Amino acid sequence: MATSKDYYEILGVSRDADQKEIKKAYRRLARKYHPDINKDDPDAEEKFKEISEAYEILSDPDKRARYDQYGHAGINEEDFNFEDFAQRGFGGFDDIFDMFFGGGMGRRRRGPRPGADLQYRMKIPFEDAAFGTTKKITIPRTETCDTCNGTGAKPGTSPKTCPQCNGSGQVRYTQRTPFGQFAQTRTCDRCGGRGTIIDDPCPTCQGSGKVRKQRKITVKIPPGVDTGTRLRMPNEGEAGDKGAPNGDLYIIIEVEPHDIFERKDDDIYCEVPISFVQAALGDKIEVPTLEGKVKFTIPEGTQPDTVFRLKNKGIPHLNGRGRGDEFIKVRVVIPEKMNDEQKELLRKFAEISGDEINPEQKSFIKKVKDAFGVG
């Protein structure tokens, strides 16, 4: 992937934008930053790739759904192919027209506003990120007023049609341009674009149609999430105007560090201490995994800092089957103090090995430490 930026921000569209809006934004930006048009701008090509990548994901319903649910973690490298865009067409007089007049030309009415999106940052333990969990949270948000059912009017009364815009929410006006006179629209300042006026407001919400509440929500966290993963909960955001959908709730994950393991992508890493005798002779030891301790055989002659791999003992993949691996690095520990018997055995070992020991030479223990790369 060429970018880690928010695809919606790149195209300048909202998260509930339809395919027509997404395509229109893409064509406008692609025309603006196309490398053939901006040959003197060294940054144009990268900008064009960024725009194309955003459109490639957001124009595909399946890819867009995965991106909305998991963010960039839900998108694989093979989901994007920049070469496809070399053949895409840009053009049409309507695109140039949009650049002069901002699009729309009065064809679109505002309508009820959807609710705003919310974000909630959640810190979870390492193990919960690996295997998934369910959490209950409480968030403050606006909800539809139960007293007036979102109309904003006092029970027993109804909102009235705005006399200035006749319920359209917009008023029409004309504008003279170098191309002639054009009719355009703007939001009605009498009703604020709602198309209705409330003479007798609801006593609970004071006419807004919404109230502030503390809402308990159950969040299902899938296995494999990591710090920065974004989980989308549709329609759990702020309430929209009557007739419009709620916004979405985005759970931003932060994973707590682990005492033993470090994570890189879906692999985990840890360090296990062994004695120099175990390294030399080999041994069967217990090593930690996410599921608990397991038996592992250290082969004889193992060198310091050797890394062993346990397949499928890492983090489950977020968007598919299988898991990462666990990598175990052995740290050879040399004893700081030994009794006379232990020292004598090592001296005999040195003699058999052909190592000459005398006071003028560095001690055999120091040799062992040097051999195993420890101080």
Curated annotation (Swiss-Prot):
Primary localisation category: cytoplasm
Q: Which GO terms describe its molecular function?
A: ATP binding; heat shock protein binding; unfolded protein binding; zinc ion binding
Give its localization.
Cytoplasm
| Taxonomic source organism | Halothermothrix orenii (strain H 168 / OCM 544 / DSM 9562)
Q: Mind listing the UniProt keywords for this protein, alphabetically?
A: Chaperone, Cytoplasm, DNA replication, Metal-binding, Repeat, Stress response, Zinc, Zinc-finger
Q: Name one GO cellular component term.
A: cytoplasm
Note the Pfam families from the entry. Answer: DnaJ, DnaJ_C, DnaJ_CXXCXGXG
* Cofactor remark: Binds 2 Zn(2+) ions per monomer.
Domain remarks: The J domain is necessary and sufficient to stimulate DnaK ATPase activity. Zinc center 1 plays an important role in the autonomous, DnaK-independent chaperone activity of DnaJ. Zinc center 2 is essential for interaction with DnaK and for DnaJ activity.
Annotated protein name in UniProt = Chaperone protein DnaJ
One GO biological-process annotation of the entry reads:
protein refolding
Q: Which amino acid positions bind Zn(2+) 2, per UniProt?
A: 162, 165, 188, 191
Required co-factors = Zn(2+)
